[in-house]
Amino acid sequence: MKSHSKKPIKALIEIPNWLGDCVMFTPAFDNIINYYNDIEITIFGSSASIELIKNHPKVVKTLTIDSKNKFSYKAFAHLGSFDVFFSFRGSIRAKIIKFIISATNKYQYSHAKYPRGHQVEKYVDFVNDCLNTNSAPGSLSCYLTNAKSKGASRILGINPGASYGSAKRWYPEQFAKIAIELSDNFDIMIFGGADELEFAKEIEGHLIKNNISNYLNLAGKTSISELTNYISNLDIFITGDSGPMHIAASLDIPTIALFGPTNPIETSQWKNPHSVIIKKDLECQPCMKRTCPLKHHNCMKLIEAREVIDSISEVSQK
């Protein structure tokens, strides 16, 4: 729908806080933009999510809200008036913000209303319900500029972290086994956030003990833009269910995704033709817990390095 007013539609959008959720939100975001066409968007959310979205040409203003910044509801009272407000979060804080801000139309996502399907589809269904449309979910979008610097060597990326909780994490020694075996054919990039340094360091320690030097430990050293650029240059990416996994999906990077407590029906890579999922079919899966409630962590512990290595040929042929 094109705006027939002289001024563009002013929209305020609360984007998902988690990096992976924010990547999965991009098809819904694109559908909003396609519906209004002439639109100016103010977004707010976590610093990681803001960095992912802020370069879109329709975004005119950003407001970062996370643990690093002192939160104040007053900031929203002074944002001015909007034609439409979308919140892609179902939190109590989001409900309060919805009440405070001035907007002609206000919409808030509810997890309970969209219990089934992939998260991409849930976000798109929410937008369809808000706008009375029937738009299909498109591909993931990456709004960051990637200056690919692909060299002659093939690159294997390994991502041992998962910010959601320890239940989603595979084991550093298993990642190390893969890196050691494949180091003759690949340069190694180790990824991770600031809270995952010890896992990356443990992998690095195994590589050093085996006299492997063709690796780069990037854990805690990249912005979201830099992370995206590094991922764009990978030949193979091995990762748990995480934000970087979804960034890789947006770039169609061949990926082996390791799933334990979470549900690949909901959060697998969206429309990545070069993706392989490895998971164990246990009665306790998916528990959706941050830590293993049964204390054995078999959903991840039973995944072996050999089956991941054997999957590389499969994902390479896709």
Regions from the PLM with identified roles:
Residues 1-318:
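Catalytic machinery of carbohydrate-active enzymes
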